[in-house]
Amino acid sequence: MRPPAPPGGSPPRNFLLREVGPRLESPAFSTCQVDFYFVESENIVKIFCGSSNQPLAKSICASIGLELGDCTVDAFPDGETFVKINENVRGEDVFLVQSTSPPTNHHLMEMFIMMDALRRASASRITAVLPFYGYARQDRKDQPRVPITAKLVANLLVAAGANRVLTMDLHAQQIQGFFDIPVDHLYAAPVIYEYLKKKALTDLVVVSPDVGGLKMAHAYSTTLEVGLAIVAKRRKNATEVESMAVIGEIRGKNVLLVDDLTETAGTLTAAATLLRKKGAKKIYACVSHAILNEMGIQRLRKSNIDELITTDTVLRPAIDGVKITTLSVAGLLGEAIKRINSNSSVTSLFELKGSRTS
């Protein structure tokens, strides 16, 4: 039987069902009358962050009108991480923002410890928000006796207490299948599209710097309604390219190189050199995650790339001698958090014109 609604109306959408009066446990009472009443329950959102990208976490909070959660993240003299959650999270919907960018292992361990603290503090749900998912390039066994570390990270996130994952531009989309919990995989592309439309570039061709990025490049070219080309390459090893060739017409065109991430910038700068030799005019590079170690910075300074367009998924210091435009994905992540909390669909956040990407 449905319990009665409160006087004057139907029960609220979010409610707790409570009994009025003592529970009768004696077998002598096979039937009894029990009254119920509805108590409205707020599905409170709290957002916390580790040390990897606090500016992004604060921007996410600002985009949805929340304060960043209060926690202490420190280290003991021997280097061990110490975490304390400084406010009540019992029964609340918690989102933990942490990019697993370099130092990757430190940021991962910090995240595991924070999730353990939140779980032990009785948070009702913990969503791991990873704007950048580290170890994503180790997604398969491509050599004998090597690990699949992307899967190991997925296992560890769940073991630490994650009930859901929100991430952006995974290096390999199949990583979503490494989890047995819900994964919401967003794309930075809508934010980047808006910037490119404002630039109003003419004679533009989208170029994938390798075969693996062709699907992403196709989505860009379809949305921007421009041509598509690809740089085919043969690798000597993980950091060196042996030979490259351009498939498509780029002579006299402005070029947009697109990729999900760059660290050493070897692929991007080598492709830019080849494209300039083949007659490209201005060369723009667009990556969701610009990790950029010292080698990558030096390569960009000497490269033919006129502008590097990226996002704030990874925190990095200012770099002299390279034109870098950083776009914020805080609004996109904030909207996803609102929808997840209210059990609304996030589908429209990862659907791109001409290509459903997830």
Task: Give, region by region, the residue ranges found by the protein language model.
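PRPP-associated nucleotide enzymes
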Residues: 1-20, 24-358
